[in-house]
Amino acid sequence: MIDTTRYPRLSRIQTPDDLRRFDEAELTAIAEELRSYLIESVGKSGGHFAAGLGVIELTVALHYLYQTPVDQLVWDVGHQTYPHKILTGRRDQIHTVKQKDGVAPFPKREESIYDTFGVGHSSTSISAALGMAIAAQRNGDDRKVVAVIGDGAMTAGMVYEALNHAGGMDPEPNLLVILNDNRMSISEAVGGLTKMLGRASGSRTLNAIREGGKKILGDKKNNPTARFVRRWEEHWKGMFVPSTLFEEMGFHYTGPIDGHDLPSLVGALKTLQTLKGPQLLHVITTKGKGYELAEGDQIGYHAVGPFDPSKGLVAKTGAKKPTYTDVFSDWVCDMAAAEPKLLVITPAMREGSGLVRFSKQYPQRYFDVAIAEQHAVTLAAGMATQGAKPVVAIYSTFLQRGYDQLVHDVAVQQLDVLFAIDRGGVVGPDGATHAGNLDLSFLRCVPHMVVMAPADEAECRQMLSTGVQYQGPAAVRYPRGTGPGAALDASLATLPIGKAQLRHSGTRIALLGFGATVDAAEAVGRELGLTVVNMRFVKPLDKALLLELAKTHDGFVTIEDNVVAGGAGSGVSELLNAEAITMPLLHLGLPDSFQHHASREDLLAEAGIDQAGIRAALLKRWPQLMISLPPALNAATG
């Protein structure tokens, strides 16, 4: 817990109603306290950091001027919402963020009436806010709806679908979009829109035009000279700011203004509250504002573990096991040296996907398409038609956004595209919106796909090489974090397609492990004298091995960190059914529900696919296996 007596104003704020009792002149001091509190809190707990620091003033202004929760705020992505959570009743719990049973890392409707829409993926806020505004209008509710979206999220096509719809509606929706322009997503924002916004925020000429207009106008508002000067200013502003883009889409554009200047923010928002129809306010902010180290390293301080704010992040020393992301990072550089046709695509996840070194060593073969997963996949398809070997490096949860393109543009045409899918399966503290629980199900049903799941780091490297060499679409799906610590070398060796690995020969029951569950399955199998197979391939399955094992075993147990519905285990059932083989089957995997935020270890245990859970499930189905346990385990289990 944090000593709130050091925050005399913030300690009096439990809800936005409390905030609105302060005089407007005190808002700057409140913002300073909120920023300091956030730094202290995230220093203790870890979590998303720099984005929240960048919207302190904006968060204070919005909750001060708008009658939340009657008026509704929709935050895009949600990385920036810790200040919002602090002001809306969760101040004393914010130190539990991302922890099991603690505060959710993103807005979550079940957690608070002030969290009006659940988010986690980018670029959804304008569509959701427009839907709310339309529903309110139809219900006769005179409420205001505000969407807060970053410039990084503005690179996604969904944003322009929503803007296009909102700007052409009759009657006009009561909608305000706030463009939080900090030139960043998680990595640096890229693309043509980013360049245009950058010209707006950094134009000395535009600032000079503004100041000149003020001097000419003085206190005059409506005389002919004033009207002429305003038209002249708007004409020149159109050359430097994106107002034309948004106004042609039907939005009234205001800005850009300094997002850290509370009086300017409050003044602009008060004016916008009096206007009808779709409005867009463009604010310029600095990610990490107020904490010098975060301002200087906005990527490194995007999300942090616990740290001492007086010292900043301290680099870890000593040897450490490579993560699966590290394995991919090394492999892709090695493969690029051996395969000149290799090209790599990422949707704005250079750091997260392990592509920093590749982007520097092979800048002409590296394509960051911004937050545009649909484009990323079809871009890869186009490259493949010309003989290139594209690799799409993407998180499992974000591949969901490019699924139609994977099916329609890649798989139907049987194009040579490799999907390097990070954060597959149980991810952990970021919760349901970032889980990779569905990918084996939605990949294995696609014709022509080869789907692989490595049991260790060395196998991951071999599978990536296999996917590049395969003629057709392939996916390697690997988990967050480290593996068991398998020895690695610089080899680019491949695996035979659809061949499993027998890990342990036993009797009675065969445990069929997929991906990250293999080690736990092997430990239990050796305890109980059972056969253990590292399946390696979710599609195609090793049909010959499975049919042979079916002749000599009394039952199969499939184990995967994917939802059971439609997953790898379902593939085994389908294979046996096609061969008219009837035998006891037990499918262990993730439940038919969205997992909450907690550590990866906690979630695996809850799902019953850690070592203890697998053992318990086996003994429940086949109690006679109890006699195979060592005495100590037998007593503990009994």
Swiss-Prot record:
One of its GO terms (biological process) is isopentenyl diphosphate biosynthetic process, methylerythritol 4-phosphate pathway. The keyword Isomerase does not apply. Pathway: Metabolic intermediate biosynthesis; 1-deoxy-D-xylulose 5-phosphate biosynthesis; 1-deoxy-D-xylulose 5-phosphate from D-glyceraldehyde 3-phosphate and pyruvate: step 1/1. CDD domains: TPP_DXS (cd02007), TPP_PYR_DXS_TK_like (cd07033). PROSITE patterns: TRANSKETOLASE_1 (PS00801), TRANSKETOLASE_2 (PS00802). It catalyses: D-glyceraldehyde 3-phosphate + pyruvate + H(+) = 1-deoxy-D-xylulose 5-phosphate + CO2. It comes from the Bacteria. SMART domains: Transket_pyr (SM00861). Keywords: Isoprene biosynthesis, Magnesium, Metal-binding, Thiamine biosynthesis, Thiamine pyrophosphate, Transferase. Its cofactor is Mg(2+); thiamine diphosphate. Binds 1 Mg(2+) ion per subunit. Mg(2+) binds at D151, N182. Belongs to the transketolase family. DXPS subfamily. Homodimer. This is 1-deoxy-D-xylulose-5-phosphate synthase. It comes from Xanthomonas axonopodis pv. citri (strain 306).
